[in-house]
Each structure stands twice: as C-alpha cells, then as structure tokens.
Amino acid sequence: MPGGLEKTCHQCISKIASNACFVVVLCAFLALPLSMTFIGMKFLEDCPIQPLIPLYLLVGGIVGTLKVSLLLYDSTRMRRLLSKAVVIDDDDDDEYPWRQNAHRYYIHLLLSLFLFLWFILGNYWVFSVYLPDFLPPFQQPQDYCDKTLYLFAVGVLALSHTVLVLLLLCSGCVYLCSRWRLAADED
C-alpha cells in the first residue's frame, strides 16, 4: 500500500511540476528571496540591537534563490522531457526519477531543511526584539533597528507562517483523500 501512495504522490507532483502555471508561480516566488537578499545587503549595518536580522534576510535570500532556481530548472527540464513525449511506464525502472537522481533529491532536501531551521532562527532573532526603536535613541545609540529592515523581516516571517500553514492543511487534505480512496477501494 505505501508503494501505491508513493506512486500516486509522484504522479501528482509530476503533473503539477510540468504545468506552465507552476513555472510562472515559481518565477513570482523568486521575487521574495531576491528582495530578501537586497534588503539584507542594503541594511546590513542598520540594526545594532539585533545584527542577525539583516544576516537572516541575506542568507535566507541567497539560499532561497538557489532553492527556487533549482526548482525552476527541474520543472523546465520535466516540461522539456514531456514535450519530447518521454513516457514513464509502470514497468519502467525510471518510475521514480528522484531515485535515479539521488544527489538532486538530497540537495533539495538539505536546502529545505536548512531553510526551515533558518526560518526558526529568524523567528527568534526578529521577535526577540519585537518593535525596537526605529531611530537611534540619544542615550543608547546602539538600541535601534531600521524600520524598513525590521518590518520587512516581520512581513517575510508572516508570509512564511501563512505558506507553512497552507502547506500543512493541503498535505492533511491530500492524506485524508488518499485514506478515503484506499478505504473505498477496499470496499
């Protein structure tokens, strides 16, 4: 049974990844990590109360750009293969291509794991100084964070939380639908 679920998930992901709309969505998603990189570089020295906030944006933006670029490459590669009418038969050894390209699978896995851990660290760094002074105070000029930088970091985290919740909800729905389908097939 797990093999059937794995095959179904693979077919679903292949259909989504080969869709032209998916490529457009990935290109739109590329704007966020690029802007994170830009904001992180521009305001690198402008948050002395928590100097890791611009570093969070800079590193997260660079790694996020790499991750989305690899996804775009894989998606366009899959579209090219499908346009050449490369069909994966059920009896073919290439039924699960990520097993054939284990290095690419592990690169995606490591990048995703790093981004998730970086997201957790970013939450700590940003919210540990929640609503800092946006202008340097006269008595303690090191206790401030640039308003654009800080609010952008909070916005990135809010968007990340939203996407994470939506992914969890969609994953739960897919799991429930597959369980109902398996139960219906058994009856």
Curated annotation (Swiss-Prot):
InterPro entries membership: TMEM272
Keyword Ubl conjugation annotated: no
Q: Topologically, how does it sit relative to the membrane? A: Multi-pass membrane protein
Q: Name one GO cellular component term.
A: membrane
| Keywords assigned by UniProt, alphabetized | Membrane, Transmembrane, Transmembrane helix
Subcellular localization is given as: Membrane
- Spans through the membrane: 21-41, 52-72, 107-127, 149-169
Q: Does the keyword Membrane apply?
A: yes
Q: What is this protein called?
A: Transmembrane protein 272
Q: From the UniProt record, report the name of the gene that encodes this protein.
A: TMEM272
